[in-house]
Design a protein with these regions (language model features):
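Nuclease catalytic cores
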Residues: 1-148, 166-180, 184-186, 190
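Short beta-strand-loop-alpha-helix junction that forms the active-site gateway
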Residues: 144-146, 152-163
Length: 192
């Protein structure tokens, strides 16, 4: 009975602590990867109506599904469908269309279009030696010159109170890709 109780007690405690990259409180071990901030169009600020969680979800959903070489008609279809799905307003629709068109015309996405290895919504799980498991989903990752290029899309990247958290998130993505593939990585926070 005592042996059984010990096994039950041991089994009742989690063996690993799982955390997601977007909520990481610390940096990954090792050297940090280069993280750069890129912007689609700094001059085309959206209105106050096209901000917040719903707008971010709208843009992210479209960026997740849109072909990297989509034309305006294809982009509009996805924006319209997601606008209806999320109950977004006309201003959010207009701003999302502009954001997605801007992102797809950005040089980073042009580079991704020509990459032989390109992943979108790329899930990662990394076990750390300290009993933690890191999980994350990368918006866009591609290989260029034998190096991972990680792109994370943010509609609120200019929010200074979130910038450090976003950069930590990218550090964890880079760490995981380097651990899994043994290739160097760099990252971009793309303000859209």
């Amino acid at each position: 009975q005592a042996s059984r109780d010990r096994v039950i007690e041991a089994g009742s405690r989690p063996e690993y602590q799982v955390f997601i990259a977007s909520q990481a409180l610390d940096l990954p071990p090792g050297e940090p990867i280069p993280v750069e901030i890129a912007a689609v169009n700094k001059h085309a600020k959206t209105s106050r109506q096209a901000a917040g969680r719903r707008f971010g979800t709208l843009v992210h959903n479209v960026m997740r599904d849109v072909p990297l070489d989509a034309d305006r008609t294809g982009i509009e279809r996805l924006v319209d469908w997601n606008t209806r799905l999320l109950g977004s307003n006309a201003e959010e629709r207009r701003a999302a269309l502009a954001a997605v068109e801007g992102a797809l015309s950005h040089p980073l996405l042009a580079r991704a279009r020509t990459a032989a290895r390109c992943h979108r919504e790329y899930p990662l799980v990394t076990r750390l030696g300290d009993g933690r498991i890191h999980e994350g989903v990368i918006d866009l990752a591609f290989v260029e010159n034998n190096e991972w290029v990680i792109v994370d899309f943010k509609t609120d990247a200019d929010a200074s109170d979130r910038r450090a958290q976003y950069e930590r998130q990218l550090q964890w993505y880079g760490f995981a890709l380097m651990q899994l593939t043994k290739m160097p990585a760099r990252a971009f926070l793309l303000e859209i």
